[in-house]
From Swiss-Prot:
This protein is involved in the repair of mismatches in DNA. It is required for dam-dependent methyl-directed DNA mismatch repair. May act as a 'molecular matchmaker', a protein that promotes the formation of a stable complex between two or more DNA-binding proteins in an ATP-dependent manner without itself being part of a final effector complex. InterPro entries: DNA_mismatch_repair_CS (IPR014762), DNA_mismatch_repair_MutL (IPR020667), DNA_mismatch_S5_2-like (IPR013507), HATPase_C_sf (IPR036890), MutL/Mlh/PMS (IPR002099), MutL/Mlh/Pms-like (IPR038973), MutL_C (IPR014790), MutL_C_regsub (IPR042121). GO terms for molecular function: ATP binding; ATP hydrolysis activity; ATP-dependent DNA damage sensor activity; mismatched DNA binding. The gene is mutL. GO terms for cellular component: mismatch repair complex. Signal peptide: none annotated. Belongs to the DNA mismatch repair MutL/HexB family. It comes from Shewanella piezotolerans (strain WP3 / JCM 13877). This is DNA mismatch repair protein MutL. Residues 352-365 have a biased composition (Low complexity). One of its GO terms (biological process) is mismatch repair. The lineage of its organism: Bacteria, Pseudomonadati, Pseudomonadota, Gammaproteobacteria, Alteromonadales. Keywords: DNA damage, DNA repair. The keyword Transmembrane helix does not apply. Residues 378-394 have a biased composition (Polar residues).
Length: 620
């Protein structure tokens, strides 16, 4: 049989087999075109599950009269001009197939008007006719597309459509998905003349939580954790079902890449792996939005654009994993039960009784460094902050030797604690009452942890004094003693789940060879391969650090000198100080300190002039 070129109408119908699967796919293509056209409102109207009528109306830029015919032809688009554009796609559509495919299997009417046109124009096309009629029409700025009698000319395809209810369910589900990621758009949906959905623009977080509740259910919206993190050119935001609220399989699983809803096994694996520590075998709900350089992701790998291919898939996987693990660990350590966390100017989080929202917020930030990393763990900035001075991922390799001034809590807060001493003996204050300030009974493991003030201090109430003991100082001293005891025998390195890779420097190979014994003593295992420094193992004290920055700084340091054990202990202590929390864990760690360290820390605590406050209060 001779090879012949297919007629345009037949070619369009073949293409429609991939693009137009059911009414929901028609609505997907048309609404995405509306969003690409800058619409802020999209109205969807369907009859009989979309098989009889699909009408999409938007207030976008519109299509000029001279482009109407071209818009209904194959491979005609305003989204791409060159191959470079294909490598960095940010729009939903880019192939120029949707309108041609839809018009080949339905009776399509396209009415549009641009802001510069005095009147609107209408284009009509039917599946059996390739000719397009252009007529004047009345229409505001924007576009309306009607697709009537879907698959009227392909009876076999029409027989495969499900019931009206089933087809409507697919449409409703797709609308929910797009409503979650495009919070700035007003979406409405009518079925058989009845208003079914009305998603108003969600410009504030409270409004978005209301939309989240509409789409995912009130239970999810009230118990989810807010995720917001950024690292280099990657930004992850959204909501994750709290471990305590998840069980079995949750159908609320939406993942977006640069605003495009995709299905990716890599993401599902990262979420399940992050959850395994808290609830093994659970597939939790999530609404996650990943933004990255469009050059780092290929969206042109699936006919319906449901899948993407990341250029650094392992990097993306581990980035999502670490972000979710950090969020859940933080919520667990702070004892959060889906409560919001307002932050002060330094980024420290405080407990709140706000009733505006039940979503726990977790945020991350990182300086603008440029390593090509495969596995990096972001450090939260809303964690319980007793190392308040740190505002980025890492601490300097050579921290300043002087101690920063500690900001005291407000006097009104302290006066509240002063009132503890005025209570009767029948109502003892929380904390340990001791007669000897140098007695180590205050740190007895059997003693209940004292009250915590501003996530920075323990309030130690004695017979005749109130003292503030810095949690940061306790954590630092605890880590220092542990590291000092273990460094003499050598630290044990822990393999990383995914090795970290950074571009290699010319002299690093020599440094690794000459300082091999020192690196082994620190529990750090490195190798160089294909121009990359591969970080394989680190001691537990460094696992929460930004390794892609920290290890190169370490190599630069030991290149010119061999640090003493004291210097190494000081460096490791600085990195490890963020591993603890202002909780019973830190208090228990305090009890492991020797008596001299406890006394030294106690002497550094700040005594409050509560008696003077009482006198001033009585005189007033």
């Amino acid at each position: 049989m001779a090879i012949e070129k297919l007629p345009p109408q037949l070619a369009n119908q073949i293409a429609a087999g991939e693009v137009v699967e059911r009414p929901a796919s028609v609505i997907k293509e048309l609404v995405e075109n509306s969003l690409d056209a800058g619409a802020t409102r999209v109205d969807i109207e369907i009859d009989k599950g979309g098989s009889k009528l699909i009408r999409i109306r938007d207030n976008g830029f519109g299509i000029p009269k001279q482009d109407l015919s071209l818009a209904l032809s194959r491979h005609a688009t305003s989204k791409l001009k060159s191959l470079d554009d294909l490598e960095a796609i940010m729009s939903f559509g880019f192939r120029g197939e949707a309108l041609a495919s839809i018009s080949s299997v339905s009776r399509l009417t396209l009415t549009s008007r641009t802001e510069t046109q005095a009147e609107a124009w209408q284009a009509k096309a039917e599946g059996t006719e390739m000719a397009v009629q252009i007529l004047p029409a009345a229409h505001p700025v924007g576009t309306t597309i009607e697709a009537v009698d879907l698959f009227f000319n392909t009876p076999a395809r029409r027989r495969f459509l499900k019931s009206d209810k089933t087809e409507f369910t697919h449409i409703d589900e797709w609308l929910k998905r797009i409503a979650l990621v495009r919070r700035d758009i007003h979406f409405t949906l009518k079925h058989n003349g009845k208003s079914v959905r009305n998603y108003r623009p969600a410009m504030t977080e409270i409004q978005y939580l209301q939309r989240l509740g509409q789409v995912c259910g009130k239970a999810f919206a009230e118990t989810c954790l807010h995720i917001s993190c950024s690292h280099n050119d990657l930004t992850l935001s959204g909501y994750l079902q709290a471990p305590g609220a998840a069980s079995g399989y949750c159908e609320t699983q939406y993942f977006y890449v640069n605003g495009r809803l995709v299905k990716d096994r890599l993401v599902n694996h990262a979420v399940r792996q992050a959850f395994s520590e808290y609830a093994a075998g659970v597939s939790p709900g999530y609404v996650l939005m990943l933004e990255l350089d469009p050059h780092q992701v290929d969206v042109n790998v699936h006919p319906a654009k449901h899948e993407v291919r990341f250029h650094q898939s392992r990097y993306v996987h581990d980035y999502i994993l670490q972000a979710l693990q950090s969020a859940m660990a933080q919520s667990s350590e702070l004892g959060l039960e889906a409560q919001p966390e307002p932050t002060d100017e330094s980024g420290a989080a405080f407990e709140s009784n706000s009733t505006n929202s039940n979503v726990s917020s977790t945020s991350y930030s990182e300086p603008n460094t440029k390593p090509v990393a495969v596995n990096e763990r972001p450090l939260t900035t809303t964690a319980t902050s007793y190392n308040q001075g740190q505002s980025s991922y890492r601490t300097p390799l050579r921290p300043a030797t002087h101690r920063a001034d500690v900001e005291l809590p407000s006097q009104s807060s302290l006066e509240a604690y002063a009132s503890l001493l005025s209570r009767s003996s029948a109502e003892p204050a929380s904390g340990k009452v001791v007669s000897n300030p140098h007695a180590s009974a205050v740190s007895d493991a059997s003693v209940k942890m004292p009250a915590v003030l501003a996530d920075k201090y323990w309030v130690i109430v004695e017979e005749d004094s109130i003292r503030l003991l810095s949690i940061a100082d306790v954590i630092k001293e605890t880590a220092r003693q542990q590291i000092q005891a273990k460094l003499a025998q050598g630290l044990v390195g822990q393999p990383l789940l995914m090795p970290v890779a950074v571009p290699v420097d010319d002299n690093w190979n020599e440094v690794i060879e000459t300082r091999e014994i020192l690196l082994r003593k620190l529990g750090i295992e490195l190798s160089i391969r294909l121009g990359q420094l591969i970080i394989k193992k680190v001691p537990p004290y460094l696992r929460d650090s930004q390794l892609a920055v920290l290890i190169p700084e370490l190599l630069q340091w030991i290149r010119f000198e061999e640090p003493s054990d004291d210097a190494l202990v000081h460096w490791l202590t600085t990195q490890a100080s963020s591993r603890f929390t202002a909780s019973a864990e830190a208090w228990l760690a305090f009890s492991t300190l020797d008596s001299s360290a406890k006394s030294a820390l106690y002497n550094q605590s700040q005594e409050l002039p509560w008696q003077q406050w009482m006198k001033e209060s009585q005189s007033d």
